[in-house]
Amino acid sequence: MFLKSIFILIVLANSIVFAQKPIDFITLDPGHFHAALVQNKMYENVNPKVNVYAPSGQDLQDHLKRINSYNTRSKNPTEWQEKVYEGNDFFEKMLVESKGATAKNSVLILAGNNLKKTEYILKAAESGLNILADKPMCIDSKGYELLKKAFVTAQKNNVLLYDIMTERSEITTVLQKELTQIPGIFGKLEKGTAENPAISIESVHYFYKYVSGSPLIRPTWFMDVSQQGEGIADVMVHLVDLAQWSAFSNVSLSSKDIKNITAKRWPTPIALSQFSLITGKKQFPDFLKKDLKNDTTINVFANGEINYSLRGIHTKLRALWNYSTPEGGDTHYSVMRGTKANVEIRQGKAEKYIPQLYIKPINISEKELIQGFENLKHKYPGIELIKKNTEWLVEIPSIYRTGHEAHFGEVMDRFLQFQAKNQLPEWEVPNMLLKYFITTKALKLAKTSS
């Protein structure tokens, strides 16, 4: 009996040690600044030593500079230690060094050139790695087929595959979703029509902008849609995600729920002088010659629009890219139309380019609105309703406005919670598959019709 008790204690002790074993981050070919943003903070139970595998070049050096800036800043400095492998065989090297138990306890972070990203995802899943990938996880129909295989493989190998959906952390988006779940305020989501959709979302982005306080120098391949992906298959992923996440909370969806997809695409012209400011390069590389509009301008197909119905809810999504903006930054517009009120996010000049949330009553009294808002005030202390002519502004305390760069850490926090349970919410995988079904099918349709 005594020996049996000792054995049980040893097993329990080993289980606790195993459960507390730190997670290892692996960064693969970090060509996009999002790869660094997930390390903008430290995490509990994560090893500060990060293995980085990449080819030699500016992408890698820029990534390491960003990590160093986080480590050396005066406020809340991080303590990351980057162990770097440079070489053309970086991917094969990563697979060899991340086998077995090491793989199960690791998170592979993918944010860079999208040309081979889906292939990397599939092979990493085959090797038993947990994967957190920046959007998009695929940029065309061929990639979508690989992605479907990757999700099947991840399930078979009992690992997680997840994409970085930062917009779910934006407080105006969170509260918009919350308000649409309150029947006393919102009523029911309208069905809408193709001409007057129930859900409309538009995001505007800029090639030249500031990140972490410095001008963002983008890699030359970012301007090549065959490597980065067209706008309709890239940033549009966020908008498709928000539409289904907001309208069908915690509901598993499939391609059978989608009807009447139409799509269009158009380019943003980028002059050589603008290209030089964006990338730091004086000439267009050879791989962009195919996109030349004339000797000094390329066309970048970064803009797109998708219209479709999701379980009968008419939805319109637009993703736009401009060169730069004299004021403000990327902007977001979203409206969800209910039978009692519309809930709208605006981020224009009138809002001083800060996203603001509005309730526009249609069939609800002021008393009903204020009463219905009370429970939300308890859940998010400090939010208030302020009347602005015929609509209401939801005043949001600054404590909730953590900012886009902080959202990457918040996504990682959620992913680490999922990894601790070794399980994603039931609806996440089918809805990720639907998301990329929509974007890749829309791209194919847009190319056919243009």
Task: Go through each PLM region and give its residues.
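A contiguous active-site-proximal alpha/beta segment in oxidoreductase catalytic domains
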Residues: 138-215
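A structural signal for well-ordered alpha-helical segments within the folded catalytic domains
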Residues: 58-61, 115-118, 122, 145, ...
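Rossmann-like dinucleotide-binding domain that binds NAD(P)(H)
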Residues: 213-316, 320-328
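Sec-dependent N-terminal signal peptides
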Residues: 3-14
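Sec/Tat signal peptide C-region and signal peptidase I cleavage site
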Residues: 15-19
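Short helix/strand-capping hinge loops at secondary-structure junctions
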Residues: 128, 134-137
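C-terminal helical cap and adjacent loop that interface with cofactors, partners, or active-site loops
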Residues: 234, 239, 244, 251, ...
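N-terminal glycine-/serine-/threonine-rich beta1-alpha1-beta2 phosphate-ribose binding loop
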Residues: 20-127, 142-161, 417-420
